[in-house]
Amino acid sequence: MTICRHRALAVVLLALTFAAAVHMAFALPPLATPNELLNFEYVQVMRQIGSLPNRGLVDSEVRYTEWHQPPLYFTFAALFGLSVPVEPSAANPPPPIEMQANPHYLSTPAGNRNPVVHVNPANTPLLYTSRVAAALLGVLGVAALYAAGKRVLGPAAGLLMGSILAFQPTYIHLGGSVNNDMPLTAVVAMVMSYAVLLVTSDGRRVASEKEI
């Protein structure tokens, strides 16, 4: 298979990864993933006050469980959703987000899969832009893993490695929810890809010196 065809397949893989995650972002019920409310709240607070929240003033141990995390994803999600209007808050931190719980959640096997009600892209758009931000980071992780595999084992192996990661149900699920796990995956994949680049470049340099 030619290099151009491998590159085209890699682009298709990344496009499918992003499409699957975005579909999950809008199909998944709001707050259906663990700690999504706390993660989303962190993003919204950053938009409300225009900076990182003052963690020393956190009034809830539950909120602090997420707010002590590194702000990489939360900052990226807040910037990605800048086009979404958010009412500013003079308090730092602002009061916790209140969402109406679904009293019939999981009460019947046929439905009631929404933990909360009256939450959708129209009235809570920042939640969905934050989910799409996670999807983008998921694509970045797949791209970095593909690059690492390609450098070591060739383009076909890189595609296989990227595909295995991209289409894991858990990975797609995380890519469609507000969480701080996707940036960790992306950073680890990028570091691994860069390490592979350094090792292979150094190996080629040593081989060239021996030939000389």
Model-found features: residue ranges?
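Transmembrane-helix signature of polytopic, membrane-embedded enzymes
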Residues: 8-10, 90-91, 97-117, 121, ...
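Short acidic/glycine- and proline-prone juxtamembrane loop motifs at membrane-interface regions
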Residues: 170-183
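Interfacial juxtamembrane loops and adjacent helix segments
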Residues: 45-133
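Hydrophobic core segments of transmembrane alpha-helices in multi-pass, intramembrane catalytic enzymes
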Residues: 39, 45, 138, 180, ...
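Transmembrane signal-anchor helices characteristic of membrane glycosylation enzymes that use polyprenol
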Residues: 6-37, 48-63, 86-90
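Specific aromatic-rich, kink-prone transmembrane helix
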Residues: 143-147, 183-203
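Short helix- or helix-capping micro-motifs
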Residues: 16-17, 161-166, 193
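Membrane-interface junctions at the ends of membrane-embedded or membrane-associated helices
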Residues: 1-5, 150-152, 196-212
